[in-house]
């Protein structure tokens, strides 16, 4: 629901929400984002109603809501990756990483709840194993994207790396805390243990929160356009978007 409200900021005004419904543009990524978001919210509400009524169809609605959640993450990732004006987002890794982060944060929250409610050691071990595996996938994707950015050697990548450097502490929190949690959950002596699972889940939640901040901060701080002037070999540089024009 909070993400649905956040779409209003992208629309510019609440009155534009009606235009999204009446005059929807199927070529717009934001339109598909709205469809996926609304579908997920509706199915989630129906599932909660079925749980409250103890209906037999709870599992069916749970599967449908789960599929809608996966589709939502893919659409969200595609929405970001198609924004070519923001080099920090414009990467094919983004949709896959969105899925990985969804599993990481989701299972970390479930693991935290399981620890608080005193779940069995077998359940904690199973949840921890899935969460740690998802963390490994996310970290590999994040490091691959960073290596690609270093090897690109373009003005856009230089601006992005500069923005990352200015937020290096936040970036390290994003990587190090989930890495520590992954090691804790993978260690045989910690499997099924409440205290390590509780600490690891908290570390993951903090790390993923830092990841979401890093998703926004470098994208908006890095120059969106580059200006290249003819005449010399050293004329390519960042061009601020604030003037509202791009000059050749």
Question: Where are the predicted features?
Answer:
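Long, contiguous internal "core" modules enriched in hydrophobic/ aromatic residues
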Residues: 37-38, 43-200, 207-210, 214
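Membrane-interface interhelical loops and short amphipathic "cap" helices
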Residues: 8-31, 77-97, 146-168, 216-246
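Transmembrane-helix bundle segments that line or gate the permeation/cavity pathway
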Residues: 1-19, 23, 29-54
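Short hydrophobic "helix-edge" motifs at membrane interfaces and signal-peptide entry regions
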Residues: 1-2, 24, 66, 201-203
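Feature marks hydrolase-like catalytic cores characterized by long aromatic- and Gly/Pro-rich stretches
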Residues: 184-187, 192, 197, 201-228, ...
């Amino acid at each position: 629901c909070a993400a649905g409200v956040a779409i209003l900021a992208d629309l510019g005004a609440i009155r534009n929400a009606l235009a999204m419904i009446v005059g929807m543009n199927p070529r717009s990524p934001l339109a598909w984002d709205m469809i996926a978001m609304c579908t997920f919210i509706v199915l989630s509400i129906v599932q909660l109603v079925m749980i409250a009524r103890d209906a037999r169809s709870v599992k069916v609605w749970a599967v449908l809501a789960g599929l809608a959640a996966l589709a939502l993450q893919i659409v969200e990732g595609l929405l970001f990756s198609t924004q070519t004006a923001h080099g920090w987002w414009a990467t094919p890794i983004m949709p896959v990483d969105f899925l990985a982060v969804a599993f990481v944060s989701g299972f970390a929250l479930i693991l935290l709840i399981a620890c608080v409610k005193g779940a069995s050691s077998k359940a904690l071990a199973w949840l921890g194993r899935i969460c740690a595996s998802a963390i490994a996938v996310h970290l590999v994707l994040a490091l691959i994207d960073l290596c690609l950015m270093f090897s690109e050697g373009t003005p856009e990548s230089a601006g992005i790396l500069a923005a990352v450097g200015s937020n290096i502490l936040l970036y390290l929190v994003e990587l190090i805390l989930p890495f520590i949690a992954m090691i804790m959950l993978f260690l045989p002596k910690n499997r099924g243990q409440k205290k390590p699972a509780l600490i690891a889940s908290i570390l993951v939640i903090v790390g993923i929160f830092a990841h979401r901040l890093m998703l926004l901060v470098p994208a908006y701080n890095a120059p969106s356009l580059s200006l290249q002037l003819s005449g010399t070999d050293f004329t390519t540089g960042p061009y601020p978007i604030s003037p509202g024009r791009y000059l050749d």
